[in-house]
Amino acid sequence: MASPRSSGQPGPPPPPPPPPARLLLLLLLPLLLPLAPGAWGWARGAPRPPPSSPPLSIMGLMPLTKEVAKGSIGRGVLPAVELAIEQIRNESLLRPYFLDLRLYDTECDNAKGLKAFYDAIKYGPNHLMVFGGVCPSVTSIIAESLQGWNLVQLSFAATTPVLADKKKYPYFFRTVPSDNAVNPAILKLLKHYQWKRVGTLTQDVQRFSEVRNDLTGVLYGEDIEISDTESFSNDPCTSVKKLKGNDVRIILGQFDQNMAAKVFCCAYEENMYGSKYQWIIPGWYEPSWWEQVHTEANSSRCLRKNLLAAMEGYIGVDFEPLSSKQIKTISGKTPQQYEREYNNKRSGVGPSKFHGYAYDGIWVIAKTLQRAMETLHASSRHQRIQDFNYTDHTLGRIILNAMNETNFFGVTGQVVFRNGERMGTIKFTQFQDSREVKVGEYNAVADTLEIINDTIRFQGSEPPKDKTIILEQLRKISLPLYSILSALTILGMIMASAFLFFNIKNRNQKLIKMSSPYMNNLIILGGMLSYASIFLFGLDGSFVSEKTFETLCTVRTWILTVGYTTAFGAMFAKTWRVHAIFKNVKMKKKIIKDQKLLVIVGGMLLIDLCILICWQAVDPLRRTVEKYSMEPDPAGRDISIRPLLEHCENTHMTIWLGIVYAYKGLLMLFGCFLAWETRNVSIPALNDSKYIGMSVYNVGIMCIIGAAVSFLTRDQPNVQFCIVALVIIFCSTITLCLVFVPKLITLRTNPDAATQNRRFQFTQNQKKEDSKTSTSVTSVNQASTSRLEGLQSENHRLRMKITELDKDLEEVTMQLQDTPEKTTYIKQNHYQELNDILNLGNFTESTDGGKAILKNHLDQNPQLQWNTTEPSRTCKDPIEDINSPEHIQRRLSLQLPILHHAYLPSIGGVDASCVSPCVSPTASPRHRHVPPSFRVMVSGL
């Protein structure tokens, strides 16, 4: 029921459509021709104008049927359209013309939409403009062909961003903001709360992907970081988990309301809600949309209360359906007055949130046509606007330019176009207590954001942070811990000083002298240096400056290294001396002076100094700061703590530590080996050999434990310092106590213990040597126990033979005295045994004077070897008279006591210092049964 043309004559045939739409129209042409026109005629409820008023026809394309979901949009905006047409006619804005809106149902179907458009072109009047376009697919197809028909289209509900392409849709305008129009508003909101790090979560749908892509460009130009971009098709949980893994706190979501329920259920499972997170999602969902989808959410094991808990506080962004300003619009009414009239007008028809944009759209068309008529009137062409046809490029361009000049205040706010896009108002709503509350709005024209006072509500005391706030915190040594360990260290140093005083004061006591007091002093010195290093290890950035800390890196390394080498080297040297004497296979008297031990310790220190000097010269230690993984704030604040730890390191730290550990490790292993070899030495003259061995074990074990644990706890300075300090304290304290406490107890309970041992007597010459040399000990290794037992058994056997020979010699002497004329017959086997006894002097290599005299005498008189003497032989010349019984008796009476006296000391008999060779052996205090322990000769220290 289209109104007749103003000219009353058929117009020229329409021009062919542009190439993109021509093919589709040709395909549908056989179907379109038999059908009747689909115009709905006048807008329902609008009064007919007087017959004398020429109409200005407008093509209305929108879904109207109830069978289509979006048909409610078309039906919902018609009351607003009727109100606008009435008000325009009443104001005589287009006099003498009137608006003739002819409605065509597109049914949100591409084919039916094209058919409606073709019917309007073929059967209807010449339409000046196209009003409508709701469904994106239908709208985009028609809008692409408008330039060929010189028609300008104005949509009130098509928000798809693809229509913003002016190269493809140059004649398309819309009063409703595009979906992309929310991006500048989001940018403004991010800046308002100083959120500079966000993440995006997008449903794999073209509409949302386009918004996301545009948002990325907007944020990129404003230096806002998009730390993570996630998309999903059906299951958003994986994407939500990735966002959490990347520490995304501000999430910009683009998804429909059905997926929104799944997203928030996943957010609840991942604990991505509450005071630490802020979700920003589309605000165009249906009212109470969560009530409609919670059943589906429950099917995914997400209860309604869980969904609401995760949704609490989200911010929705959408265009403002009506302006909230109390300002009169172009119609002379405020938005609130219009809304009341609209509600009265719709009379049972469901409302549409686009009704305000449809209302302003009619006013845009009226104002555009008014400006176009003014332009035609001012031109010299004398053309009337009702003379428009689809081939009139000039009038089409005039209408297009008039659309771009639109600028007025409507019920939806300021109406102005920029490249065909509405610069409208964007509102922000927040989900609070199961309802959406408006909290602010963004004016695109003025580029201003207005937050309504006290309406926006965050779940924390402040807006969420855009990322985890990282508080770099230097891990320091605890002051109480440092104080306690320092106090223990001071006590240890006082104890070491007391031991040093004790050692110096009693250095002339034989008990102390036999334990090498000079080496003991070195042990004390090394212990005190080790104690001193504890103070330096506890000084970090909380006590000293960075430059001082770097200096301490070198100083404490040197002090600990030198202290360790001094103490352990002295113990090592003393253990080596015991081992060297104890392993003396030749049974020689062995003298190892303290000077030689000092050389050993000095050599170890020299090696240390060479390593340390090269280390310092080539690759010195520097202060480095190591960053560790973030830790939650113990106070529960929305921050994470990144521990920083100071280290003393250099470029080739591993190599230098390897050299030092290899050298010290080999030395320690060798020391432990020597201590193990001499573990059974228990000789009073070596009064601290066993304790020195125990000290070596102590140092070795504690150092290994300390080095291993210090590496494992390098990220915990308090634990590391505590372990290192305790290892040094225990190691030094136990060592000093093992070395000095037994001596202290012995001197206190038995001051003469060193001189009362009857198993060790010193000669006069050895006593003189005590002031110059150290103890020389002859001993046997435990590994040679069988050999020792054999020698002891042989010693006992020979002593028994001596006793038997004594008796035989006494009998011979008595016989010689009774028969001086006769030659006494001595049994050859007795001579042989006695001769063997004489030869034992060579085995012992003793320096006794009596044995040397006897040996020389026998060498000069080989005839005295009794095993070769024949008793029946008689003297035939003066030379042979020396073997006469008188000579034999005289020699035996003088030489046998000397022989007896000289031999006994070598097997545990009389003291070698006995001045009278004629004294009976039984008179000597040493002429007694030898206990089953090996006897040694000891020279004084």
Swiss-Prot record:
In which residue ranges is the amino acid composition biased (Polar residues)? 773-787
Give a GO biological-process term: neuron-glial cell signaling
Q: What's the impact of mutating I705N? A: In DEE59; increased basal signaling activity and no stimulation by GABA agonist; when injected into Xenopus tadpoles, causes abnormal swimming patterns and increased frequencies of seizure-like behavior compared to wild-type-injected animals; no effect on cell surface expression
The protein's recorded glycosylation sites are N90, N298, N389, N404, N453
Does the keyword Cell membrane feature in the UniProt annotation?
Answer: yes
Q: Which residues lie on this side of the membrane: Extracellular?
A: 42-483, 544-551, 619-654, 713-720
Residues annotated with Phosphoserine modification = S776, S779, S884, S893, S913, S916, S920, S924
Q: Which residues form a coiled coil?
A: 781-819
**Pfam families annotated for this entry?**
7tm_3, ANF_receptor, GBR2_CC
Cysteine pairs forming cystine bridges in this chain are C108-C135, C237-C266, C265-C302
Region annotation (Disordered) maps to 763-790
Where does it reside?
Cell membrane; Postsynaptic cell membrane
Entry membrane topology: Multi-pass membrane protein
Question: Can you supply one Gene Ontology CC term for this chain's record?
Answer: cytoplasm
Residues modified as Phosphothreonine are T819
Protein family membership: Belongs to the G-protein coupled receptor 3 family. GABA-B receptor subfamily.
Q: What does this protein do?
A: Component of a heterodimeric G-protein coupled receptor for GABA, formed by GABBR1 and GABBR2. Within the heterodimeric GABA receptor, only GABBR1 seems to bind agonists, while GABBR2 mediates coupling to G proteins. Ligand binding causes a conformation change that triggers signaling via guanine nucleotide-binding proteins (G proteins) and modulates the activity of down-stream effectors, such as adenylate cyclase.
Quaternary state and interactors: Heterodimer of GABBR1 and GABBR2. Homodimers may form, but are inactive. Interacts (via C-terminus) with ATF4 (via leucine zipper domain).
The molecule here is called: Gamma-aminobutyric acid type B receptor subunit 2
**What is the scientific name of the source organism?**
Homo sapiens (Human)
